[in-house]
Amino acid sequence: DHEIAAAAGVPIPTIFEMEGEQGFRSRETAILKKLIVLPHIVLSTGGGAVLKEENRALIRKSGTVVYLHAPPETLLERTRCDNSRPLLQVADPLAKLRELYAARDPVYRQTADFTVESANCRETVQTLLKRLSR
């Protein structure tokens, strides 16, 4: 999302306001195409990036894909004070996160080479280092 906002010159909520989610997703694909050709990068995509088949194909071609899994309740804690997430600016953000999770979790699992639970930062890093060094 950072790269999308930087390229657009405006924050993500402004892109959503002006172009809607569809416009944002188009920008997301364009940025992915630019980033995946860079050597030796760690690419952290936005939550909805894998919903588009074209993006999934791009991501899979770029290298090892890791799904950093967290349940909706954990995601709410992590995003509670983040006003830059247009899809969560609703009356019940936990319900929205559960809805997004139900739709996205199977796609993330299908796209990823492996999944890592991301509840504890230190354990997540240790698991990633072990898995990626194989």
Curated annotation (Swiss-Prot):
Its EC number is 2.7.1.71. GO terms for biological process: amino acid biosynthetic process; aromatic amino acid family biosynthetic process; chorismate biosynthetic process. It comes from the Bacteria. InterPro entries: P-loop_NTPase, Shikimate/glucono_kinase, Shikimate_kinase/TSH1, Shikimate_kinase_CS. Keywords: Amino-acid biosynthesis, Aromatic amino acid biosynthesis, ATP-binding, Cytoplasm, Kinase, Nucleotide-binding, Transferase. One of its GO terms (cellular component) is cytosol. Gene3D superfamilies: P-loop containing nucleotide triphosphate hydrolases. It is found in: Cytoplasm. It holds the Pfam family SKI. Its main location: cytoplasm. CDD domains: SK. It catalyses: shikimate + ATP = 3-phosphoshikimate + ADP + H(+). GO terms for molecular function: ATP binding; shikimate kinase activity. Pathway: Metabolic intermediate biosynthesis; chorismate biosynthesis; chorismate from D-erythrose 4-phosphate and phosphoenolpyruvate: step 5/7. Belongs to the shikimate kinase family. This is Shikimate kinase. The gene is aroK.
